[in-house]
Amino acid sequence: MSILNEPQGAAAAEDSYENELPVRRKQPGNVVVKWLTTTDHKTIGTLYLVTSFAFFCIGGVMALLMRAELARPGMQIMSSEQFNQAFTMHGTIMLLMFATPLFAGFANWIMPLQIGAPDVAFPRLNMFAYWLYLFGSLIAVGGFLTPQGAADFGWFAYSPLSDAVRSPGIGADMWIMGLAFSGFGTILGSVNFITTIICMRAPGMTMFRMPIFVWNVLLTGVLVLLAFPVLAAALFALEADRKFGAHVFDAANGGALLWQHLFWFFGHPEVYIIALPFFGIISEVIPVFSRKPMFGYMGLIGATIAIAGLSVTVWAHHMYVTGGVLLPFFSFMTFLIAVPTGVKFFNWIGTMWKGSLSFETPMLWATGFLITFTFGGLTGVILASPPMDFHVSDSYFVVAHFHYVVFGTVVFAMFSGFHYWWPKFTGKMLDERLGKITFWTLFVGFHGTFLIQHWLGAEGMPRRYADYLAADGFTALNTISTICSFLLGLSILPFLYNVWKTAKYGKPVGVDDPWGYGRSLEWATSCPPPRHNFLTLPRIRSESPAFDLHHPEIAALDQLENAGHGEKAAVAGGKEAGK
């Protein structure tokens, strides 16, 4: 029996010949060119995530070298100069080459999906921003290849330590210009994010239907535009001092304090630039695994706006011991910024309260974040008080505090986001057992490393020192901290194995929302999404459009609960008519 319109004769032979042609395989060169020239926000997001994670591993190795040096008194494996280079580049890498671009990676991948956009507003600018970040970072790190080594004046580059007399090497110039280069990429990326959020939201997505993560990306972008131009100006002025004798930061003219004001006016908003997006990730994860909508959605947005506003008023709390700042004002503003942060915790815990909690790996990391960040916040209250700060400033107490705050936010939320969105990134789920092994080894290793450093700081151990005396009494605590730091470092290995195992043996999820209770719009498209993200967009009538799509009966109940009297009558009348 023949099929209608089946080709006959020569046409059939030609068709048969075409069907027998081998399928063209992907050539490695084609794949490389595609990745190097892509303007797809998802691919660019992947590049940001992979590159920033690679820098995370490099910065972690430097941290382990420093901890190995400090395990016992005396110089073990590094000279003092090498130690200075290690702690300078460790801080620079972790803050400006890992945490900041990690935000750009998650924002690139997830934000356009959550607002129903086909891409970002300026795709080519997006790619240009990534290359600025990559090459700027490589220039800064490339100082290790120069005869005098990398920058060694601390990641904050205090003047006059960073001038041409005290830091004459080319590595310092590469650090300055590399960070300026990378910072331009961050600025351009933030312009892109703000424009995309303002101009490219799907029909029905008002500002107060946007996911919390999108709100946080928007406010982070605003902070970048406030902070990074100040850093760029300060870096160019410092380079002018070094190369052209500009005398901007001469100590005789008050330049040392001027540098600190400029740098920390960037530096403290930077803390929230690397905190707010990761608060947003936690705000996406907790409702899904609590089986509840976010408690206090409007209050959470208000708290985020308050944190962003207050973050540019507290920079001089890094400068209490200089004697050149108004202590009551900056102390009060620092205490004040704890209030909206407390509101956020109230919202997160309120969402979990009486929820149907499910501790899959993303929720486990989110819970670890809540515990760790709380510890960091408590020590922050101590440091906000000038009389107490005077005693522990520049000690390991400060090191412990900011690692609890920064690591507790960025790394815990990063792993939570990886496990939560991995099926959206790749179409496959990461292994739960390996994820929990990673969590517990990292959790124990982290707290063992840094909890002890509070006590070291209280006993008077200064930060940035390459050595100490056996008579100082710091040996036992330093040894414990170093052992736990290597456990922390080893915790990354199960995650890397998990990624490899999932890529090679993982089964495709086959559904839009493998978690079953996803609320935001990225869970209303396939895993992974098509090139322009959506084939069709669901109706957006709340801040949980994907949940409304997959659970229409609950959405109808919510609509009835939140409707006015006239709307309730209409809904009820429609139900009766349906019967």
Swiss-Prot record:
Documented EC number(s): 7.1.1.9
The regions listed as transmembrane in this protein's record are: 44-64, 93-113, 125-145, 174-194, 217-237, 262-282, 295-315, 319-339, 363-383, 397-417, 437-457, 480-500
Topological type in the membrane: Multi-pass membrane protein
Q: Which UniProt keywords apply?
A: Cell membrane, Copper, Electron transport, Heme, Iron, Membrane, Metal-binding, Respiratory chain, Translocase, Transmembrane, Transmembrane helix, Transport
Cofactor: bound how, per the entry note?
Binds 1 copper B ion per subunit.
Instruction: Tell where it localizes.
Output: Cell membrane
- Residues that hold Fe(II)-heme a according to the record: 90, 403
Give yes or no: UniProt keyword tRNA processing: no
State the superkingdom.
Answer: Bacteria
Which is a GO BP term held by this UniProt record?
respiratory electron transport chain
Please report which protein family the annotation says this sequence is part of. Answer: Belongs to the heme-copper respiratory oxidase family.
**What is the stated purpose of this protein?**
Cytochrome c oxidase is the component of the respiratory chain that catalyzes the reduction of oxygen to water. Subunits 1-3 form the functional core of the enzyme complex. CO I is the catalytic subunit of the enzyme. Electrons originating in cytochrome c are transferred via the copper A center of subunit 2 and heme A of subunit 1 to the bimetallic center formed by heme A3 and copper B.
Quaternary structure, per UniProt, is: Associates with subunits II, III and IV to form cytochrome c oxidase.
- Name of the protein this chain belongs to: Probable cytochrome c oxidase subunit 1-alpha
**Organism expressing this protein natively:** Streptomyces avermitilis (strain ATCC 31267 / DSM 46492 / JCM 5070 / NBRC 14893 / NCIMB 12804 / NRRL 8165 / MA-4680)
Recall the taxonomic lineage recorded for the source organism: Bacteria, Bacillati, Actinomycetota, Actinomycetes, Kitasatosporales
Q: What gene does the UniProt entry assign to this protein? A: ctaD1
